[in-house]
Design a protein with these regions (language model features):
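Extended amphipathic alpha-helical repeat scaffolds
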Residues: 1-243, 254-263, 269-276, 290-297, ...
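Amphipathic alpha-helical segments within extended alpha-helical solenoids and repeat-rich scaffolds
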Residues: 326-327, 398-400
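Hydrophobic core positions within HEAT/HEAT-like alpha-solenoid repeats
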Residues: 266-267, 300-304, 342-343, 373-374
Length: 400
Protein backbone atom coordinates (compact mmCIF):
# COMPACT_ATOMS: atom_id res chain seq x y z
CA UNK A 1 0.00 0.00 0.00
CA UNK A 2 1.31 3.41 -0.97
CA UNK A 3 1.70 6.04 1.74
CA UNK A 4 0.21 9.49 1.31
CA UNK A 5 0.91 12.87 2.85
CA UNK A 6 -2.34 12.44 4.79
CA UNK A 7 -0.93 9.28 6.41
CA UNK A 8 2.13 11.24 7.52
CA UNK A 9 -0.01 14.05 8.94
CA UNK A 10 -2.06 11.55 10.97
CA UNK A 11 1.10 9.89 12.29
CA UNK A 12 2.46 13.26 13.35
CA UNK A 13 -0.80 14.27 15.05
CA UNK A 14 -0.78 11.04 17.09
CA UNK A 15 2.99 11.19 17.75
CA UNK A 16 3.35 7.78 16.17
CA UNK A 17 6.76 6.25 17.10
CA UNK A 18 7.12 5.17 13.46
CA UNK A 19 6.69 8.72 12.10
CA UNK A 20 10.30 9.00 10.91
CA UNK A 21 10.10 5.60 9.21
CA UNK A 22 6.93 6.66 7.40
CA UNK A 23 8.58 9.86 6.17
CA UNK A 24 11.65 7.96 4.92
CA UNK A 25 9.44 5.36 3.21
CA UNK A 26 7.38 8.02 1.44
CA UNK A 27 10.52 9.82 0.27
CA UNK A 28 11.74 6.61 -1.39
CA UNK A 29 8.34 5.50 -2.67
CA UNK A 30 8.05 4.97 -6.45
CA UNK A 31 5.57 7.21 -8.22
CA UNK A 32 2.22 5.52 -8.96
CA UNK A 33 1.42 4.52 -12.54
CA UNK A 34 -1.24 6.87 -14.03
CA UNK A 35 -4.68 5.37 -14.69
CA UNK A 36 -4.64 6.65 -18.25
CA UNK A 37 -1.93 7.60 -20.77
CA UNK A 38 -0.31 11.00 -20.27
CA UNK A 39 -0.73 13.54 -23.07
CA UNK A 40 2.56 14.37 -24.74
CA UNK A 41 1.88 18.07 -24.12
CA UNK A 42 1.04 17.62 -20.42
CA UNK A 43 3.30 19.26 -17.86
CA UNK A 44 5.05 16.66 -15.69
CA UNK A 45 7.71 16.89 -13.03
CA UNK A 46 10.08 14.83 -15.16
CA UNK A 47 9.69 17.27 -18.06
CA UNK A 48 10.39 20.08 -15.62
CA UNK A 49 13.64 18.37 -14.56
CA UNK A 50 14.67 17.63 -18.14
CA UNK A 51 14.27 21.30 -18.99
CA UNK A 52 16.11 22.83 -16.03
CA UNK A 53 19.13 20.58 -16.60
CA UNK A 54 19.27 21.13 -20.35
CA UNK A 55 22.25 23.13 -21.73
CA UNK A 56 19.95 25.62 -23.47
CA UNK A 57 18.12 26.41 -20.23
CA UNK A 58 21.33 26.71 -18.20
CA UNK A 59 22.65 29.19 -20.76
CA UNK A 60 19.83 31.63 -19.94
CA UNK A 61 20.25 34.48 -17.43
CA UNK A 62 19.91 33.40 -13.79
CA UNK A 63 16.90 35.65 -13.18
CA UNK A 64 15.08 34.17 -16.17
CA UNK A 65 15.80 30.62 -14.99
CA UNK A 66 14.50 31.40 -11.51
CA UNK A 67 11.30 33.01 -12.76
CA UNK A 68 10.57 30.06 -15.06
CA UNK A 69 11.17 27.51 -12.30
CA UNK A 70 8.86 29.33 -9.88
CA UNK A 71 6.08 29.52 -12.46
CA UNK A 72 6.38 25.87 -13.48
CA UNK A 73 6.33 24.69 -9.86
CA UNK A 74 3.20 26.80 -9.30
CA UNK A 75 1.51 25.08 -12.24
CA UNK A 76 2.62 21.62 -11.11
CA UNK A 77 1.27 22.22 -7.59
CA UNK A 78 -2.02 23.77 -8.71
CA UNK A 79 -5.19 21.97 -7.59
CA UNK A 80 -6.38 21.72 -11.20
CA UNK A 81 -3.05 20.39 -12.52
CA UNK A 82 -3.57 17.80 -15.26
CA UNK A 83 -1.11 15.42 -13.59
CA UNK A 84 -0.98 15.87 -9.79
CA UNK A 85 2.44 15.74 -8.18
CA UNK A 86 3.45 12.44 -6.58
CA UNK A 87 2.99 12.38 -2.81
CA UNK A 88 6.74 12.13 -2.20
CA UNK A 89 7.22 15.48 -3.92
CA UNK A 90 4.96 17.12 -1.31
CA UNK A 91 7.02 15.96 1.65
CA UNK A 92 8.59 19.39 2.01
CA UNK A 93 5.31 20.56 3.57
CA UNK A 94 5.60 18.12 6.48
CA UNK A 95 9.31 18.78 7.01
CA UNK A 96 8.74 22.54 7.05
CA UNK A 97 5.93 22.08 9.57
CA UNK A 98 8.29 20.10 11.78
CA UNK A 99 10.75 22.97 11.54
CA UNK A 100 8.20 25.70 12.39
CA UNK A 101 6.85 23.66 15.32
CA UNK A 102 9.19 24.60 18.17
CA UNK A 103 8.29 21.65 20.42
CA UNK A 104 11.02 19.26 21.60
CA UNK A 105 9.20 16.39 19.90
CA UNK A 106 9.19 18.12 16.51
CA UNK A 107 12.84 19.08 16.93
CA UNK A 108 13.81 15.48 17.72
CA UNK A 109 11.89 14.12 14.74
CA UNK A 110 13.32 16.78 12.41
CA UNK A 111 16.93 15.98 13.36
CA UNK A 112 16.30 12.27 12.90
CA UNK A 113 14.68 12.90 9.50
CA UNK A 114 17.67 15.00 8.42
CA UNK A 115 19.97 12.15 9.42
CA UNK A 116 18.12 9.45 7.49
CA UNK A 117 16.08 10.88 4.64
CA UNK A 118 17.40 10.46 1.08
CA UNK A 119 18.46 13.69 -0.61
CA UNK A 120 15.76 13.71 -3.26
CA UNK A 121 13.26 16.21 -4.61
CA UNK A 122 10.46 16.90 -2.19
CA UNK A 123 12.43 16.63 1.05
CA UNK A 124 15.31 18.61 -0.45
CA UNK A 125 13.06 21.61 -1.05
CA UNK A 126 12.49 21.86 2.70
CA UNK A 127 16.03 20.96 3.74
CA UNK A 128 17.50 23.72 1.59
CA UNK A 129 15.16 26.27 3.18
CA UNK A 130 15.94 25.05 6.71
CA UNK A 131 19.68 25.15 5.98
CA UNK A 132 19.51 28.87 5.18
CA UNK A 133 17.29 29.60 8.18
CA UNK A 134 19.56 27.65 10.55
CA UNK A 135 22.54 29.55 9.20
CA UNK A 136 20.82 32.88 9.81
CA UNK A 137 19.82 31.93 13.37
CA UNK A 138 23.15 30.27 14.26
CA UNK A 139 21.39 27.00 15.03
CA UNK A 140 24.53 24.85 15.20
CA UNK A 141 22.91 21.41 15.72
CA UNK A 142 20.48 21.86 12.83
CA UNK A 143 22.98 23.47 10.49
CA UNK A 144 25.62 20.89 11.37
CA UNK A 145 23.28 17.98 10.65
CA UNK A 146 22.32 19.41 7.25
CA UNK A 147 25.88 20.37 6.33
CA UNK A 148 27.21 16.91 7.18
CA UNK A 149 24.47 15.28 5.08
CA UNK A 150 25.52 17.38 2.11
CA UNK A 151 29.19 16.64 2.76
CA UNK A 152 28.57 12.88 2.94
CA UNK A 153 26.29 12.73 -0.10
CA UNK A 154 27.64 10.94 -3.17
CA UNK A 155 24.85 10.94 -5.77
CA UNK A 156 21.98 13.28 -4.87
CA UNK A 157 18.90 13.42 -7.08
CA UNK A 158 19.41 17.14 -7.65
CA UNK A 159 22.42 18.70 -9.37
CA UNK A 160 25.94 18.18 -8.05
CA UNK A 161 26.54 21.90 -8.52
CA UNK A 162 23.88 22.58 -5.88
CA UNK A 163 25.51 20.10 -3.54
CA UNK A 164 28.95 21.69 -3.98
CA UNK A 165 27.44 25.12 -3.35
CA UNK A 166 25.90 23.95 -0.07
CA UNK A 167 29.20 22.43 1.04
CA UNK A 168 31.15 25.59 0.26
CA UNK A 169 28.52 27.72 1.96
CA UNK A 170 28.65 25.59 5.12
CA UNK A 171 32.43 25.81 5.35
CA UNK A 172 32.33 29.55 4.64
CA UNK A 173 29.99 29.91 7.62
CA UNK A 174 32.38 28.02 9.90
CA UNK A 175 35.42 29.87 8.55
CA UNK A 176 33.85 33.27 9.15
CA UNK A 177 32.82 32.16 12.63
CA UNK A 178 36.41 31.16 13.37
CA UNK A 179 37.67 34.50 12.11
CA UNK A 180 35.15 36.74 13.89
CA UNK A 181 34.10 34.70 16.96
CA UNK A 182 36.84 32.11 17.57
CA UNK A 183 35.54 31.40 21.07
CA UNK A 184 32.39 29.74 19.67
CA UNK A 185 34.00 28.07 16.63
CA UNK A 186 34.79 24.76 18.44
CA UNK A 187 31.20 24.49 19.68
CA UNK A 188 29.80 24.99 16.18
CA UNK A 189 32.36 22.74 14.52
CA UNK A 190 31.63 20.01 17.07
CA UNK A 191 27.99 19.90 16.01
CA UNK A 192 29.06 19.60 12.39
CA UNK A 193 31.52 16.79 13.15
CA UNK A 194 29.06 14.94 15.39
CA UNK A 195 26.70 14.40 12.46
CA UNK A 196 29.11 12.38 10.31
CA UNK A 197 28.67 8.61 10.25
CA UNK A 198 31.12 5.74 9.91
CA UNK A 199 30.19 5.14 6.26
CA UNK A 200 31.50 8.59 5.28
CA UNK A 201 33.94 8.68 2.35
CA UNK A 202 36.34 10.99 4.18
CA UNK A 203 38.64 11.65 1.22
CA UNK A 204 35.66 13.09 -0.70
CA UNK A 205 34.44 15.48 1.99
CA UNK A 206 34.89 19.24 1.90
CA UNK A 207 33.70 20.57 5.26
CA UNK A 208 35.26 17.82 7.39
CA UNK A 209 38.55 18.09 5.54
CA UNK A 210 38.70 21.82 6.13
CA UNK A 211 38.05 21.32 9.85
CA UNK A 212 40.81 18.71 9.98
CA UNK A 213 43.30 19.84 7.32
CA UNK A 214 42.62 23.49 6.45
CA UNK A 215 46.19 24.54 7.23
CA UNK A 216 47.63 22.12 4.66
CA UNK A 217 46.27 24.51 2.01
CA UNK A 218 45.96 21.44 -0.23
CA UNK A 219 42.64 22.46 -1.75
CA UNK A 220 41.20 24.25 -4.74
CA UNK A 221 37.85 25.93 -5.24
CA UNK A 222 35.78 22.75 -4.91
CA UNK A 223 37.89 19.88 -3.63
CA UNK A 224 40.95 18.86 -1.67
CA UNK A 225 44.02 17.23 -3.07
CA UNK A 226 45.31 14.00 -1.59
CA UNK A 227 45.92 14.13 2.16
CA UNK A 228 48.33 11.53 3.48
CA UNK A 229 47.03 9.44 6.40
CA UNK A 230 50.29 10.35 8.16
CA UNK A 231 49.34 14.05 8.23
CA UNK A 232 48.94 15.30 11.80
CA UNK A 233 45.44 16.73 11.74
CA UNK A 234 45.90 18.38 15.14
CA UNK A 235 48.67 20.54 13.66
CA UNK A 236 46.81 21.20 10.41
CA UNK A 237 43.26 21.68 11.78
CA UNK A 238 41.51 24.97 11.19
CA UNK A 239 41.68 27.50 14.05
CA UNK A 240 43.94 25.37 16.22
CA UNK A 241 44.17 28.02 18.94
CA UNK A 242 40.38 28.16 19.26
CA UNK A 243 40.25 24.41 19.96
CA UNK A 244 42.91 24.85 22.67
CA UNK A 245 40.87 27.33 24.73
CA UNK A 246 38.73 24.78 26.58
CA UNK A 247 38.18 21.01 26.65
CA UNK A 248 34.39 21.36 26.96
CA UNK A 249 33.52 21.32 23.21
CA UNK A 250 35.72 18.26 22.69
CA UNK A 251 34.19 16.47 25.68
CA UNK A 252 30.71 17.14 24.31
CA UNK A 253 31.80 16.04 20.85
CA UNK A 254 33.00 12.75 22.27
CA UNK A 255 29.54 12.04 23.67
CA UNK A 256 27.72 13.17 20.50
CA UNK A 257 29.95 11.65 17.80
CA UNK A 258 28.53 8.95 15.54
CA UNK A 259 31.77 8.06 13.72
CA UNK A 260 34.97 6.51 15.05
CA UNK A 261 37.33 8.94 13.23
CA UNK A 262 35.51 11.83 14.92
CA UNK A 263 35.89 10.20 18.32
CA UNK A 264 39.59 9.72 17.61
CA UNK A 265 39.97 13.39 16.70
CA UNK A 266 38.30 14.43 19.97
CA UNK A 267 40.36 12.00 22.08
CA UNK A 268 43.66 12.91 20.44
CA UNK A 269 42.96 16.62 20.89
CA UNK A 270 42.03 16.13 24.55
CA UNK A 271 45.18 14.10 25.22
CA UNK A 272 47.41 16.59 23.42
CA UNK A 273 45.93 19.90 24.54
CA UNK A 274 44.38 19.19 27.95
CA UNK A 275 46.43 16.44 29.61
CA UNK A 276 47.02 18.57 32.72
CA UNK A 277 43.36 19.58 33.14
CA UNK A 278 42.20 15.99 32.67
CA UNK A 279 44.39 14.80 35.54
CA UNK A 280 41.46 15.99 37.66
CA UNK A 281 38.77 14.25 35.58
CA UNK A 282 35.36 13.84 37.21
CA UNK A 283 34.65 10.19 38.06
CA UNK A 284 30.98 10.53 37.10
CA UNK A 285 31.90 11.88 33.67
CA UNK A 286 34.21 8.92 33.16
CA UNK A 287 31.38 6.56 34.15
CA UNK A 288 28.99 8.31 31.76
CA UNK A 289 31.57 8.02 28.98
CA UNK A 290 31.88 4.29 29.55
CA UNK A 291 28.11 3.89 29.37
CA UNK A 292 27.64 5.60 26.02
CA UNK A 293 25.47 3.33 23.82
CA UNK A 294 28.30 2.57 21.39
CA UNK A 295 31.15 0.08 21.15
CA UNK A 296 34.26 2.13 20.45
CA UNK A 297 37.90 1.08 20.63
CA UNK A 298 38.82 4.77 20.67
CA UNK A 299 36.73 5.42 23.78
CA UNK A 300 38.03 2.26 25.46
CA UNK A 301 41.59 3.44 24.86
CA UNK A 302 40.75 6.93 26.12
CA UNK A 303 39.20 5.56 29.32
CA UNK A 304 42.45 3.73 30.08
CA UNK A 305 44.43 6.89 29.33
CA UNK A 306 42.23 8.88 31.73
CA UNK A 307 42.64 6.28 34.47
CA UNK A 308 46.40 6.28 34.07
CA UNK A 309 46.63 10.06 33.66
CA UNK A 310 44.82 10.87 36.91
CA UNK A 311 46.96 10.50 40.06
CA UNK A 312 43.88 10.49 42.32
CA UNK A 313 42.38 7.39 40.68
CA UNK A 314 44.11 4.44 42.32
CA UNK A 315 43.07 0.91 41.41
CA UNK A 316 42.44 0.01 45.05
CA UNK A 317 39.62 2.59 45.07
CA UNK A 318 37.91 1.52 41.83
CA UNK A 319 35.20 -0.56 43.52
CA UNK A 320 34.30 2.26 45.90
CA UNK A 321 34.28 4.86 43.11
CA UNK A 322 32.15 2.77 40.75
CA UNK A 323 34.98 2.21 38.27
CA UNK A 324 35.40 -1.52 38.89
CA UNK A 325 32.64 -2.66 36.51
CA UNK A 326 33.91 -0.25 33.85
CA UNK A 327 37.38 -1.79 33.86
CA UNK A 328 35.93 -5.31 33.91
CA UNK A 329 33.93 -4.33 30.83
CA UNK A 330 37.20 -3.58 29.04
CA UNK A 331 37.94 -7.31 29.06
CA UNK A 332 35.69 -7.38 25.99
CA UNK A 333 37.37 -4.43 24.28
CA UNK A 334 38.77 -4.74 20.77
CA UNK A 335 41.49 -2.26 21.73
CA UNK A 336 44.62 -4.21 22.73
CA UNK A 337 45.83 -1.56 25.18
CA UNK A 338 42.47 -1.41 26.96
CA UNK A 339 42.23 -5.20 27.10
CA UNK A 340 45.76 -5.51 28.47
CA UNK A 341 45.00 -2.91 31.15
CA UNK A 342 41.85 -4.78 32.19
CA UNK A 343 43.70 -8.11 32.35
CA UNK A 344 46.37 -6.67 34.63
CA UNK A 345 43.68 -5.03 36.78
CA UNK A 346 41.89 -8.36 37.23
CA UNK A 347 45.12 -10.10 38.17
CA UNK A 348 45.85 -7.47 40.82
CA UNK A 349 42.41 -6.41 42.06
CA UNK A 350 39.65 -8.72 40.82
CA UNK A 351 40.63 -12.35 41.00
CA UNK A 352 37.20 -13.00 42.56
CA UNK A 353 35.30 -12.65 39.27
CA UNK A 354 32.12 -14.79 39.37
CA UNK A 355 32.30 -18.16 37.62
CA UNK A 356 29.41 -17.11 35.37
CA UNK A 357 31.49 -14.14 34.20
CA UNK A 358 34.52 -16.36 33.59
CA UNK A 359 32.44 -18.78 31.53
CA UNK A 360 31.13 -15.90 29.44
CA UNK A 361 34.62 -14.52 28.89
CA UNK A 362 35.85 -17.99 27.96
CA UNK A 363 33.78 -17.73 24.79
CA UNK A 364 35.98 -14.85 23.58
CA UNK A 365 38.68 -15.93 21.09
CA UNK A 366 41.48 -13.73 22.47
CA UNK A 367 44.52 -15.78 23.59
CA UNK A 368 45.56 -13.42 26.41
CA UNK A 369 42.03 -13.40 27.79
CA UNK A 370 41.87 -17.20 27.57
CA UNK A 371 45.11 -17.43 29.56
CA UNK A 372 43.62 -15.21 32.28
CA UNK A 373 40.41 -17.26 32.45
CA UNK A 374 42.37 -20.52 32.72
CA UNK A 375 44.46 -19.01 35.50
CA UNK A 376 41.44 -17.85 37.51
CA UNK A 377 39.51 -21.08 36.99
CA UNK A 378 42.47 -23.10 38.25
CA UNK A 379 42.12 -21.24 41.56
CA UNK A 380 38.49 -22.33 42.05
CA UNK A 381 37.24 -25.48 43.73
CA UNK A 382 36.39 -27.73 40.74
CA UNK A 383 33.36 -29.32 42.40
CA UNK A 384 31.96 -26.69 44.74
CA UNK A 385 32.54 -23.56 42.63
CA UNK A 386 32.54 -24.91 39.08
CA UNK A 387 30.58 -28.15 38.84
CA UNK A 388 30.19 -30.64 36.02
CA UNK A 389 28.08 -28.39 33.81
CA UNK A 390 30.69 -25.61 33.81
CA UNK A 391 33.49 -28.08 33.14
CA UNK A 392 31.50 -29.48 30.24
CA UNK A 393 31.15 -26.01 28.72
CA UNK A 394 34.86 -25.29 29.10
CA UNK A 395 36.04 -28.59 27.67
CA UNK A 396 34.01 -27.94 24.53
CA UNK A 397 36.03 -24.78 23.82
CA UNK A 398 39.32 -24.87 21.82
CA UNK A 399 41.40 -22.91 24.38
CA UNK A 400 40.42 -25.14 27.32
Amino acid sequence: MQLTLSDIEKAWASKDPALVDYIITLASQPDPVPDKPIRSEALTFQKFLNTIFSPSFLAKPTEEQQAWRVEQIRLLEAEDAELPLAERLKLHKIILLLWTDKSLYARHVLLEVITKIPLVYGPWRALKHIFKAAEASNDYPLLGALAARCDMAIKPEFSRATLLYMRRRAWRYLRQLGQTLPVVYPEAASHFLAAYTDDTHWQQTWIAKHIFYHETHAYGSAQFGYISPKTNLLDKRAFKEAWQRSPEPLLRLLSMARAEPIRKFACDALKTDFAVILRDVEVQWLIDLAHLPVRSTVIDNFIVWLLQNSPKLEQQQFRKLGLHTIVIGLLESQDSEALNYAIHYVKAQARDLPVSELLRLALKPNADLAKLVRQLISERDPRRELGLEAWGQLLALPNY
